[in-house]
């Protein structure tokens, strides 16, 4: 059922973005937008802009849009919200623009407008098109909330206002970290809930004797409860490792801009942005101790990936054991 829903979402995105097999839908009302490459027609109803429209044409690779991953879209919105508040606080962003930008980011973080995030997960650069997709959608939603028309960038500009004091190289990895943190907030409790279920079954079967095995051969006696208790302990350890690994995601390079030197970002901005992210996520987000290292290194992602892999291996092991234990019914293990 979930796959069917996702497929419907993908079809909805295709229609909303005005694309089918790479061909624009005919007779669709458009508005003209301009970038350094020239003018381009964008669907009038779209909240994205010219940069996203070009990316939709250039990067039809996997067929998997950003919208398929709501935590990532929300992570982009939360990151942009923190950046806007930090820029306003240090006097870089006109505070009159902040209110509609805040409302737009909050709406996207709550799940609205996700059908406008159609850029392919595989794209040129280090997330440049995804970053601009977020900038353009937030800008146009903010414009509409301020009573203006989409594309009225003299009032709120996707790059100058929404990407202020930022680069894709600090905004996108920070958004990814926020996305993983949001996912972890659901994954850890569910893992612990599964562990609790195994522990309850273990308590109910602690006196049932069975044969313990090594390499599938008879070894020494044990109880079913002992076996299930071990599975519960393994899951609890995996959940704790996820929590421990999450801490590797707390150091962000927002304010480092393109390579970590912080060029074109006001000096107080980085610390203020980290504080705003901490408020929005409820986590102790901090500025990375070395912004250049944090910009080129994937260490935090590798640490968290290892914890995810550990959980996957743990679940696979338990599932395999359950298959063997459920063999039979007359002459099984």
Regions found by a protein language model. Name each.
Residues 4-6, 13, 20, 24-333:
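Conserved, well-structured ligand/cofactor-binding cores
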């Amino acid at each position: 059922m979930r796959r069917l829903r996702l497929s419907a979402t993908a079809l909805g995105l295709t229609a909303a973005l005005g694309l089918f097999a790479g061909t624009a839908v005919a007779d669709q009302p458009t508005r003209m937008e301009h970038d350094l490459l020239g003018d381009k027609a964008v669907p009038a109803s779209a909240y994205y802009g010219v940069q996203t429209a070009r990316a939709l044409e250039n990067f039809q690779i996997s067929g998997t849009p950003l919208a398929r991953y709501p935590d990532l879209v929300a992570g982009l919105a939360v990151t942009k919200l923190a950046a806007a508040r930090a820029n306003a606080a240090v006097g870089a962003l006109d505070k009159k623009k902040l209110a509609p930008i805040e409302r737009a980011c909050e709406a996207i973080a709550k799940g609205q407008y996700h059908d406008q995030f159609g850029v392919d997960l595989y794209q040129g650069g280090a997330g440049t098109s995804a970053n601009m997709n977020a900038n353009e959608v937030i800008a146009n939603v903010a414009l509409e909330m301020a009573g203006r028309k989409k594309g009225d960038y003299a009032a709120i500009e996707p790059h100058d206002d929404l990407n202020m004091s930022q680069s894709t190289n600090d905004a996108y990895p920070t958004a990814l970290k926020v996305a993983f943190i949001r996912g972890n907030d659901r994954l850890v409790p569910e893992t612990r809930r599964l562990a609790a279920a195994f522990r309850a079954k273990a308590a109910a079967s602690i006196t049932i004797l069975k044969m313990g095995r090594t390499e599938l051969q008879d070894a020494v006696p044990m109880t079913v409860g002992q076996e299930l208790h071990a599975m519960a302990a393994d899951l609890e350890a995996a959940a704790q490792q996820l929590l421990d690994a999450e801490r590797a995601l707390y150091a962000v390079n927002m304010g480092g801009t393109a390579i970590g030197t912080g060029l074109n970002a006001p000096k107080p901005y980085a610390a203020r942005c980290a504080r705003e992210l901490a408020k929005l996520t409820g986590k102790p987000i901090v500025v990375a101790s070395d912004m250049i290292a944090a910009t080129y290194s994937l260490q935090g992602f590798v640490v968290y990936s290892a914890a995810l892999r550990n959980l996957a291996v743990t679940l696979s092991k338990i599932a395999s054991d359950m298959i063997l234990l459920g063999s039979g019914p007359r002459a099984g293990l």
